[in-house]
Regions:
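Gram-negative (and chloroplast) outer-membrane scaffold detector with strong preference
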Residues: 50, 55-122, 197-199
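Hydrophobic, lipid-facing positions within transmembrane beta-strands of outer-membrane proteins
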Residues: 14-16, 36-40, 75-79, 83, ...
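Flexible, solvent-exposed coil segments and beta strand-coil junctions
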Residues: 16-22, 55-64, 118-126, 173-178
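Short loop/turn motifs that connect adjacent beta-strands in outer-membrane beta-barrel proteins
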Residues: 4-13, 49, 87-95, 150-156
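Outer-membrane beta-barrel transmembrane domain signature
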Residues: 96, 102-201
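Short glycine/proline- and aromatic-enriched beta-strand/turn motifs that initiate or cap beta-hairpins
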Residues: 2-45, 55, 198-201
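Generic detector of contiguous secondary-structure segments
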Residues: 1, 37-45, 60-65, 88, ...
Length: 201
């Protein structure tokens, strides 16, 4: 007997997801840049096909080299939609594979607390303090991902994200090395993977 696509009207859902990678990323990296933070994602859907998504979080990145140390610290917000690509054969199926889009913004503070110089002008071993400043950034994202129900109402998720910077404020003398929620803006684009755990209410 051939399986039939489930045509029963599916109930809507509200799902809260927590990013698994951001809180521990800095502990497993030996790179000069140490990143930490957290992120939560809220999904709302009426029919398991179109999901309205709101994501919010904070990131802090400390970058240390021989000549200077800089910190980028701030909040970010994303809003958009996911479209489920799955066709269900059983109304109990809740796994999804989706594509999506986001519009995103971040407000953050950039600090250069230590700028070490050895020169005939500044003297040997002098430290110059550059005042901190507040910045904003706006970008768009494309998303491809999946969420799989591992036990009732509990989901593990992963998604691949590509982002394009639309605008960010910057001082010409001191380049921003990290935008919270985006990454390094110097090339104008960013690509990364998110892993999350979520609960359906």
């Amino acid at each position: 007997m051939q399986a039939q696509t489930d045509t029963t009207k599916r109930k809507g859902l509200v799902r809260l997801n927590i990013d698994l990678l951001s809180p521990v990323y800095g502990y497993f990296s030996d790179a000069p840049a140490k990143r930490m933070g957290g992120e939560a994602m809220l999904e709302i859907s009426k029919n398991d096909t179109l999901f309205y998504v709101l994501e919010a979080g904070f990131h802090k990145m400390e970058y240390t080299r021989d000549l200077f140390q800089t910190t980028s610290n701030g909040l970010f917000l994303r809003a958009g939609v996911n479209r489920n690509l799955m066709k269900y054969y059983n109304k109990k199926d809740k796994d999804i594979v989706y594509i999506g889009a986001r519009v995103s913004a971040s407000t953050y503070q950039l600090d250069y607390p230590v700028f070490n110089l050895d020169s005939t002008y500044f003297g040997k071993g002098k430290s110059v303090v550059v005042p901190s400043a507040n910045y904003m950034a706006f970008w768009v994202e494309g998303v491809f991902g999946t969420r799989i129900e591992v036990v009732k109402n509990l989901f593990l998720g992963a998604d691949l994200r590509g982002a394009l910077m639309v605008y960010h404020t910057n001082q010409s003398a001191y380049k921003t090395l990290f935008v919270p929620g985006f990454g390094n803006p110097l090339n104008g684009a960013s690509l990364w993977v998110n892993y999350s755990v979520g609960y359906k209410f």
